[in-house]
């Protein structure tokens, strides 16, 4: 199972939120490039980067900083937050970003995902499904749709998406453990798409359980920043 430490960027800093609430923001590192270097030096291979300003504004707000992370560290990077146009995706891929995550647009304009898949391929395009009580949340989690997470996942899989990131918003940043039941259900419904888990991870035992369920990767944020799981443990777990 792949482990992806997370860097959430807001106002140029690495931050953590609780349940996606921008009022509950903690700066975990003033210097995003420094944080990326810490991951690189620990032997981490792949990181998950979220442009929170971008998610709120619907644009690639921290694009230059993210391009700098790639240039400086050479880490494999997936990026999400504010992806609304094909040009943005093209731009991120052109500076060496490995995967781009489409979130809100998958719910509001599914055709956009199809267009991105046709142009860039399923290894470059990831769909992020964020849910509150099983219903998909959009626009930086400020809005909740009437679509449930399984329906959206199946629609995306049918379209050709091969990698989904599922975040349980109610667990994100809470350190209360992932919603294992949701992952089991999701994986049972899918036939070809793989799932990356995100939200609520608080101990190595969570990672073991997710691996057992059949999750392809896990994003780790607060558990690392709080000191509950070390980078050494994450590296060893990944093998």
Swiss-Prot record:
One Gene Ontology term of the molecular function aspect: 1-(5-phosphoribosyl)-5-[(5-phosphoribosylamino)methylideneamino]imidazole-4-carboxamide isomerase activity
Taxonomic superkingdom: Bacteria
EC assignment: 5.3.1.16
Location of this chain's protein in the cell: Cytoplasm
Cystine pairs: none
Keywords assigned: Amino-acid biosynthesis, Cytoplasm, Histidine biosynthesis, Isomerase
EC primary class: isomerase
GO CC annotation: cytoplasm
InterPro entries (UniProt xref): Aldolase_TIM, His_biosynth, HisA_bact_arch, Isoase_HisA-like, Isoase_HisA-like_bact, RibuloseP-bd_barrel
Family to which this protein belongs: Belongs to the HisA/HisF family.
Protein name as catalogued: 1-(5-phosphoribosyl)-5-[(5-phosphoribosylamino)methylideneamino] imidazole-4-carboxamide isomerase
Protein's organism: Streptococcus mutans serotype c (strain ATCC 700610 / UA159)
């Amino acid at each position: 199972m792949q482990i992806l430490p997370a860097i959430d960027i807001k106002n140029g800093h690495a931050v953590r939120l609780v349940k996606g609430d921008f009022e509950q923001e903690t700066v975990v590192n003033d210097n995003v490039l420094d944080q990326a270097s810490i991951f690189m030096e620990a032997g981490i291979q792949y990181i998950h980067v979220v442009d929170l300003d971008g998610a709120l504004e619907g644009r690639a707000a921290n694009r230059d900083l993210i391009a700098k992370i790639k240039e400086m560290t050479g880490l494999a990077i997936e990026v999400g937050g504010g992806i609304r146009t094909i040009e943005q995706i093209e731009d991120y891929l052109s500076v060496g970003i490995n995967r781009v995550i489409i979130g809100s647009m998958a719910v509001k304009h599914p055709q956009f995902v199809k267009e991105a898949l046709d142009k860039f391929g399923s290894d470059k395009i990831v769909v992020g499904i964020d849910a509150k009580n099983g219903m998909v949340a959009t626009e930086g989690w400020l809005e909740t749709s009437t679509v449930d997470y399984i329906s959206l996942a199946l629609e995306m899989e049918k379209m050709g998406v091969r990698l989904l990131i599922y975040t349980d918003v109610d667990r994100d940043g809470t350190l209360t453990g992932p919603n294992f039941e949701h992952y089991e259900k999701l994986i049972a419904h899918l036939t070809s798409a793989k799932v990356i888990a995100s939200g609520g991870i608080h101990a190595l035992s969570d990672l073991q359980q997710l691996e057992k369920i059949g999750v392809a990767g896990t994003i780790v944020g607060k558990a690392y920043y709080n000191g509950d799981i070390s980078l050494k443990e994450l590296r060893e777990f990944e093998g």
